[in-house]
Amino acid sequence: MYARPLARLIEQLQRLPGVGPKTAQRLALHILKRPESEVEALAQALVEAKKQIGLCSVCFHLSSEPVCEICRNPNRENNTICVVADSRDVIALEKTREFKGKYHVLGGVISPMDGIGPEQLTITPLLRRVSQQQPKEVILAISPSVEGETTTLYVGQLLKPFTKVTRIAFGLPVGGDLEYADEITLARALEGRRELD
C-alpha cells in the first residue's frame, strides 16, 4: 500500500502517545510535502533533544543542565515542594503561575498491573530531600486515577512524619490528567489544597 520508507515513517509516528494510524499517516504525508531543510531541522531537533535533555539531579524534572532552572531559581520558595507524577504536570502547573515553590517529579505512579512499584519511582530521593531540606509543606499534585490515588496515599503516609502534607483540591473528573486541565481549574485546585488525613 505504501512505499517502504513511508510505511516505516508511519509506523514510527504511531509509537508516539495519542497518535493512531490515521494521524500517523497525515503527519507522514505532511512531512513529505515540506522542504528537505525543514525535515532535516525536525530530525536534528529530535536527536538534539534526546541527547541534551536529561533529568534534574534535585527534582527529576526535564533539564538540559544538571540542576533545572526551577531548582536554581533563587526567587522560588524552598519551604514548599509540589510532588507530581511527571514533567508534563510541572509544565501544566507552571502555566498557572500560582505555585512559587519547587517540584519533585516521581517519574510515574504506582501501577502493579504495569510492573511499576514504589522502587521504580523517585520516592527514596524525595524522602531524603524532605528530611534534609525540612520544607514546611509538601503538596501532592497527582492525577486522581486509581493509580494516582494509590501513589498519593502511599507517598503521603511516608512523608507525614517529616512535614505537613497536603493534596491539591480537584475540579477534575476521576481518571482525568493534570496536563489536560485548563489554567483556571489548576489554579483553583492549588488554592483549595487540603491536608491529608
UniProtKB/Swiss-Prot annotation:
Pfam families per the record? RecR_C (PF21175), RecR_HhH (PF21176), RecR_ZnF (PF02132), Toprim_4 (PF13662)
Where are the zinc-finger regions (C4-type) in this chain? 56-71
An example GO BP is: DNA recombination
* Every Toprim domain range: 79-173
Q: Which InterPro entries match?
A: DNA_Rcmb_RecR (IPR000093), Hlx-hairpin-Hlx_DNA-bd_motif (IPR003583), Rcmb_RecR (IPR023627), Rcmb_RecR_Znf (IPR015967), TOPRIM_dom (IPR006171), TOPRIM_RecR (IPR034137)
The UniProt record lists the keyword DNA repair: yes
A molecular function annotated in GO for this UniProt entry is: zinc ion binding
Lineage: superkingdom: Bacteria
Keyword tags:
DNA damage, DNA recombination, DNA repair, Metal-binding, Zinc, Zinc-finger
Q: Which family does it belong to?
A: Belongs to the RecR family.
Which HAMAP family has this protein been placed in?
Answer: RecR (MF_00017)
Any idea what job this protein has?
Answer: May play a role in DNA repair. It seems to be involved in an RecBC-independent recombinational process of DNA repair. It may act with RecF and RecO.
List the PANTHER family: RECOMBINATION PROTEIN RECR
**The protein, known as:** Recombination protein RecR
Q: Name the gene.
A: recR
